[in-house]
Amino acid sequence: IGAQTYACPVYEKVGFVRTDYAYIEDGIPHVRMIQELA
């Protein structure tokens, strides 16, 4: 997913990990995240 950087801690609590550098989308900082499925 492309998560807004301020929301990353929420996604990390449910198993997502950051995979890339921050980027700007629509004027808002985002970071790419993935969640591996077991």
Regions found by a protein language model. Give the residues of each.
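Aromatic-lined ligand-binding clefts that engage carbohydrates, nucleic acids, or primary amines
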Residues: 1
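C-terminal "cap" of GNAT-fold acetyltransferases
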Residues: 4-8, 24-38
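A secondary-structure capping/hinge motif
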Residues: 18-20
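Conserved active-site tyrosine of GNAT-family acetyltransferases
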Residues: 11, 16
